[in-house]
Amino acid sequence: MASKLLRAVILGPPGSGKGTVCERIAQNFGLQHLSSGHLLRENLKTGTEVGDVAKQYLEKGLLVPDHVITRLMMSELETRSAQHWLLDGFPRTLVQAEALDGICDVDLVISLNIPFETLKDRLSRRWIHPSSGRVYNLDFNPPQVQGIDDITGEPLVQQEDDKPEAVAARLRRYKDAAKPVIELYKSRGVLHQFSGTETNRIWPYVYTLFSNKITPIQSKEAY
């Protein structure tokens, strides 16, 4: 078993179950799960320099550009250089992937593919706790009390961009941006693609992939 630090990435459109898979990987293998969305929210909330720059774009209804997200992630990764980590939501574009290349070699990339109809149904059942980013799904991860966050008791909201037309546009945007990233990692022999909708079905394969790279801290039965 190699003793080098593991550098892993998970790719997938919003609603593909990335967050759930990442949580299981982190729990079973002790990796740091670094979500670009979560880090962005934290920086917006605490008013860091990069958070303030991102806010200027978001207030205009614009996507946060590559260079801002890259700067956010690079500064976080600098502080995590002695840890195994798993990136979620980064790199989303070829420019971001090339920036990541500048600081490390990625060992393992998982790409989750999901049919549009499934994604549309799943996102329409999705409710979010805005301040923490916690996500609930009414079918397979419902809150204990409908419309209320389990931990804080604050109300949950549905996002505008979880509506079908918005989901279709997001999926197209994701695919257009992710295609060259997927091709890059495929050409390096580090990409593993999974199609389907059920985390439980793909989990044994994901567990095996990571087990070949890093010693588990608990068995795969620990869901």
Swiss-Prot record:
Database matches in Pfam families: ADK, ADK_lid
Keywords: Acetylation, ATP-binding, GTP-binding, Kinase, Mitochondrion, Nucleotide-binding, Transferase
Chain sites annotated for binding a ribonucleoside 5'-triphosphate: 15-20, 126, 135-136, 199
Residues annotated with N6-succinyllysine modification: 60, 179, 186
Gene3D superfamilies, per the entry: P-loop containing nucleotide triphosphate hydrolases
InterPro entries with a match to the protein in the record: Adenyl_kin_sub, Adenylat/UMP-CMP_kin, Adenylat_kinase_CS, Adenylate_kinase_lid-dom, AK3/Ak4_mitochondrial, AK4_mitochondrial, P-loop_NTPase
UniProt keyword Kinase present: yes
Binding site for AMP: 36, 41, 62-64, 89-92, 96, 170
UniProt-listed PROSITE patterns: ADENYLATE_KINASE (PS00113)
EC number, as in UniProt: 2.7.4.4, 2.7.4.6
Gene Ontology CC, one term: mitochondrial matrix
Localization annotation: Mitochondrion matrix
Residue ranges of the region described as NMP: 35-64
Tissue: Expressed in kidney, liver, stomach, brain, spinal cord, heart, ovary, oviduct, colon, jejunum, ileum and testis (at protein level). In the brain, expressed in the pyramidal cells of the cerebrum and glial cells in the cerebellum (at protein level). In the heart, expressed by myocytes (at protein level). In the kidney, expressed in the proximal to distal tubule in the cortex and the outer and inner zones of the medulla (at protein level).
Record has Ion transport as a keyword: no
Catalytic activity: a ribonucleoside 5'-phosphate + ATP = a ribonucleoside 5'-diphosphate + ADP; AMP + ATP = 2 ADP; GTP + AMP = GDP + ADP; CMP + ATP = CDP + ADP
Modified residues (N6-acetyllysine): 175, 179, 186
Domain writeup: Consists of three domains, a large central CORE domain and two small peripheral domains, NMPbind and LID, which undergo movements during catalysis. The LID domain closes over the site of phosphoryl transfer upon GTP/ATP binding. Assembling and dissambling the active center during each catalytic cycle provides an effective means to prevent GTP/ATP hydrolysis.
Function description: Broad-specificity mitochondrial nucleoside phosphate kinase involved in cellular nucleotide homeostasis by catalyzing nucleoside-phosphate interconversions. Similar to other adenylate kinases, preferentially catalyzes the phosphorylation of the nucleoside monophosphate AMP with ATP as phosphate donor to produce ADP. Phosphorylates only AMP when using GTP as phosphate donor. In vitro, can also catalyze the phosphorylation of CMP, dAMP and dCMP and use GTP as an alternate phosphate donor.
Subunit structure: Monomer. Interacts with SLC25A5/ANT2.
Annotated protein name in UniProt: Adenylate kinase 4, mitochondrial
Organism for this UniProt entry: Mus musculus (Mouse)
Lineage: Eukaryota, Metazoa, Chordata, Craniata, Vertebrata
Gene that encodes the chain: Ak4
